[in-house]
């Protein structure tokens, strides 16, 4: 089983990782710095997301140090590139704790990276806030675990709940669904949730397959789905797969009534630039969009700072997917340190579990299993994208409509899919 397999990896996996220390903005604080260690995907398929998260974290670090640090000490981030390779993760966290002897650790990005860290974290008894990772703690049930992903108390179905709710509300209601997923931890979890949502709404599953993560040709998969003739298609995929799926669907002129769901990558500017109008009609999850009702105290100031530095840092120019969340999840740890006046993992975990935190993405409260007490997962539809669309298009809301949840809804779905093409 995936989660158990990674417990056997050791420090040797770090050999290929790259250590980097973020600069400190303040030097006036006394004492040794408080060190916070983590792995982040800075190369490999998830680098476009990992790099923007890192910049968000570095901005937090600089802001904290400019105000005097924490507990009268400066803060220093200590991080390794996990290369989007789960096998590096146990070794990285072992080295951070046993060799680098960091004061605290924080989680990596993505389910496939967070899960293999858990045995090390649990053995060491460390508080562990991860960035995005779907249902990572479902089997471990570790009481010091917290997830910044807004998937809520029932994480697996949350990624596609809005997708299925939207489909079920159409008249006539679609009857059949195809489910397709990469054979990887996140995609399998999301697709398990999609099955739950399909059953909830009485959809008949006519296609349910997984494909190898190394797949590059998605035309045969799309043809197989076409042959099953589903009304709607839910896809659970990672970035390069998502791009390949969108291209294959358009190249084959496939037009189900609704398509999308849990496709990682479509949120990133680099992939939106690549796909442009091919995205029209797709319905997919987002975790934050620049809508007025999702702008909180500090949101605009953060993104102004992030975007002014993005080009020099070689990261996503907008940072909407993970830049803000990178800032938010480490700010929770920082606020807990300040409130408890402590670096004790037990005290920090107890405080985090009981407290509602104010972040640049709004107030966040954790519930059972360290998941959000209430889901904040969005489903949006892309539409009206013209050839040559670029960053000024992606900067705003004209090309996307929030369909769910109701408190963030900005419009209604264009249905069926071909009407938005």
Identify the residue ranges that each predicted region occupies.
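Short, low-complexity disordered leader/linker segments with a strong preference
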Residues: 1-35, 415-421
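Signal peptide-proximal N-terminal region
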Residues: 29-31, 55-77, 168-169, 199-202
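Extracytoplasmic "Venus flytrap"
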Residues: 33-58, 80-87, 109-110, 180-189, ...
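Solvent-exposed, acidic/polar segments of extracytosolic/periplasmic ligand-binding ectodomains
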Residues: 34, 353-421
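Beta-alpha junction/loop-to-helix N-cap segments that form part of ligand/metal-binding clefts
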Residues: 35, 48-55, 68-140, 148, ...
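Hydrophobic alpha-helical segments within soluble ligand-binding/sensing domains
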Residues: 89, 149-173, 217-219, 242, ...
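Extracytoplasmic ligand/sensor domains, especially the bilobed periplasmic-binding protein
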Residues: 102-208, 257-284
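Extracellular/periplasmic periplasmic-binding protein-like sensory domains
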Residues: 150, 249-327, 338, 394, ...
């Amino acid at each position: 089983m995936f989660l158990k397999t990674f417990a056997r990896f050791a420090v040797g996996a770090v050999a290929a990782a790259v250590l980097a220390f973020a600069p400190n903005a303040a030097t006036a604080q006394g004492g040794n710095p408080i060190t916070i260690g983590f792995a982040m995907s800075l190369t490999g398929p998830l680098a476009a997301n990992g790099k923007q998260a890192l910049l968000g974290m570095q901005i937090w670090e600089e802001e904290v140090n400019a105000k005097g640090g924490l507990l009268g000490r400066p803060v220093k981030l200590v991080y390794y590139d996990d290369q989007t390779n789960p096998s590096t993760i146990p070794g990285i966290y072992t080295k951070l704790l046993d060799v680098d002897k960091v004061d605290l650790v924080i989680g990596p990005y993505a389910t496939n990276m967070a899960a293999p860290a858990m045995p090390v974290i649990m053995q060491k008894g460390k508080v562990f806030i991860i960035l995005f990772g779907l249902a990572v703690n479902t089997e471990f049930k570790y009481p010091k675990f917290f997830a910044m992903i807004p998937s809520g108390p029932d994480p697996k179905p949350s990624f596609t709940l809005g997708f299925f709710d939207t489909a079920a509300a159409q008249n006539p209601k679609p009857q059949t669904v195809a489910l397709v997923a990469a054979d990887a931890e996140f995609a399998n979890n999301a697709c398990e949730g999609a099955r739950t949502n399909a059953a909830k709404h009485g959809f008949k599953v006519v296609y349910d397959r997984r494909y190898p993560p190394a797949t590059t040709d998605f035309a045969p998969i799309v043809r197989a789905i076409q042959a099953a003739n589903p009304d709607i298609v839910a896809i659970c995929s990672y970035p390069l797969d998502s791009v390949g799926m969108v291209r294959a669907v358009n190249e084959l002129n496939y037009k189900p009534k609704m398509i999308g769901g849990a496709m990682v990558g479509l949120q990133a500017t680099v992939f939106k630039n690549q796909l442009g109008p091919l995205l029209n009609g797709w319905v997919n999850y987002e975790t934050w969009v620049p809508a007025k009702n999702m702008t909180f105290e500090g949101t605009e100031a953060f993104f102004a700072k992030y975007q002014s530095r993005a080009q020099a840092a070689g990261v996503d120019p907008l940072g909407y997917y993970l830049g803000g969340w990178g800032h938010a999840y480490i700010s929770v740890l920082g606020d807990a340190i300040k409130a408890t006046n402590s670096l004790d993992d037990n005290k920090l975990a107890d405080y985090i579990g009981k407290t509602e935190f104010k972040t640049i993405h709004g107030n966040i409260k954790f519930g059972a299993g360290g998941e959000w007490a209430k889901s904040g997962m969005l489903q949006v539809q892309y539409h009206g994208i013209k050839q040559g669309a670029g960053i000024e298009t992606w900067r705003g809301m004209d090309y996307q409509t929030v369909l769910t949840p109701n408190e963030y809804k900005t419009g209604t779905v264009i249905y069926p899919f071909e009407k938005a093409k």
